[in-house]
UniProtKB/Swiss-Prot annotation:
Protein name: Phosphopentomutase
Binding site for Mn(2+) 2: 298, 303, 351
Source organism of this protein record: Streptococcus thermophilus (strain ATCC BAA-491 / LMD-9)
Cellular compartments annotated: Cytoplasm
Needed cofactors: Mn(2+)
Record-linked InterPro entries: Alkaline_phosphatase_core_sf, DeoB, Metalloenzyme, Phosphopentomutase_DeoB_cap_sf
The keyword ATP-binding is annotated on this UniProt entry: no
Length: 403
């Protein structure tokens, strides 16, 4: 019998808690990540008021300098620690795959200066359409269609862009480039980005509609991912017949592997919380695991180096946390963590190599406090231990610490 009948893991995308020991091996605009500290710098520069996460023990997590505006709790209601990444990467897929038990020794390729001409030329030859070279760089998905949508409507050229993650995205106005044609082009792009020097995690079709100045992305997005290179704990749970619920982009990150209930993409963090609560309160979800990604911290504020917006986004999530807790059953476990850092006060616009926070809460807890500092994959090892399945490649369970 499982110690916790249901386990819920929420990834606050990019909410790091201080530079990892190997942070200086990773850079942002030529600056090593060694001084990065997402939560620390937000707390120090613009203030952070997250009483519900603080109550669980966020301010108790060991740090050289305590979080300036998140007080430590003398009697927290949950368990807290920080976790270190061992994989060679600081992107979304690497972080999530390691959380689910894999050790990524060869990171995916990212393209901060845009994709090489060879890739663009191959896509042009396959599609019969030109590629807009000026969009070929890391770009906001809404800004790129605002900037180049009018030109695409006139010329039929492809808008190709990337991000901090190992992705190639193609935006196309549905009235100019039909969705099925866009999908075919993306499938070709997927076929030529499966190995180095362009090993990409995902190809994303980004259809949109509207007129210049009023473009809107549609729900016809399609992600062409690659599956994890080895079974994750999600696969182990699925094979054992245990329910696994995906909220947000989790299913895309794992290419659907090990997911048997997908709640769909989130329109926003708040929509993601709504979807999580919908799953938690479903009569069908009696036993199993839910896995949620809330990406707004990263996509809207981290890469754009907006500490005020990032802080407000954290406040917004913290205000919803009591609703999530209210949806829990007595023998549920809630876990809150991250997948990497993205310090909005730091150099550059890329992710930062950081520890991630880990908070755990159950209505059944008799005790609380700190658990030892560990590694990302300890989360999945703990999940596997709870449900009686094998862990994946790496990770050590701390299930016995949660009492």
């Amino acid at each position: 019998m499982s110690k916790f009948n249901r386990m819920h893991l929420i990834v606050l995308d990019s909410v790091g808690i201080g530079a990892a020991p190997d942070a200086n091996n990773f850079v942002n605009a030529g600056v090593p990540d060694g001084a990065s500290d997402t939560l620390g710098h937000i707390s120090k520069t613009v203030g952070l008021n997250v009483p519900n996460m603080a109550k669980l023990g966020l301010g108790n997590i060991p740090r050289e300098q305590p979080l300036k505006t998140v007080p430590a709790e003398s009697n927290p209601t949950g368990y807290a620690t920080k976790l270190e990444e061992v994989s060679l990467g600081k992107d979304t897929m690497t972080g999530h795959w390691e959380i689910m038990g894999l050790n990524i020794t060869e990171p995916f390729d990212t393209f901060w200066n845009g994709f090489p001409e060879e890739i663009l030329t191959q896509i042009e030859e396959f599609s019969g359409r030109k590629v807009i070279r000026e969009s070929n760089r890391p770009y906001s998905g809404t800004a790129v269609i605002d900037d180049f949508g009018p030109r695409q409507m006139e010329t039929g050229e492809l808008i190709i862009y990337t991000s901090a993650d190992p992705v190639l995205q193609i935006a196309a106005h549905e009235d100019i480039i039909p969705v099925e044609e866009l999908y075919r082009i993306c499938e070709f792009a997927r076929s030529i980005t499966l190995e180095r020097p362009a090993l990409l995690g995902r190809i994303i079709a980004r259809p949109y509609v509207g007129e210049p100045g009023n473009f809107t992305r549609t729900s016809n997005r399609r992600d062409l991912a690659i599956s994890p290179f080895a079974p994750t704990v999600l696969d182990k749970l699925n094979e054992a017949g245990i329910d696994t619920y995906s909220v947000g982009k989790i299913s895309d990150i794992f290419n659907g592997e090990g997911i048997n209930h997908d709640m769909g993409h989130n329109k926003s963090n708040n929509h993601g919380v709504d979807n999580l609560i919908k799953a938690m309160t479903s009569e069908d979800f009696k036993h199993g695991f839910s896995f949620t990604n809330l990406v707004d911290f990263d996509a809207l504020y981290g890469h754009r180096r907006n500490p005020q917006g990032y802080r407000d986004c954290l406040h917004e999530f913290d205000e919803r946390l009591p609703e999530i807790i209210a949806a829990m059953k007595e023998d549920d476990l809630l876990m809150i963590t991250a997948d990497h850092g993205n310090d909005p006060t730091y150099a550059g616009t890329d992710h930062t190599r950081e520890y991630i926070p880990f908070l755990a809460y159950s209505p059944s807890f008799k005790c609380s406090g700190l658990i030892p500092v560990g590694h990302f994959a300890d989360i999945s090892a703990t999940i596997a231990d709870n449900f009686g399945v094998e862990k994946a490649m790496i990770g050590e369970s701390f299930l016995d610490k949660l009492v």
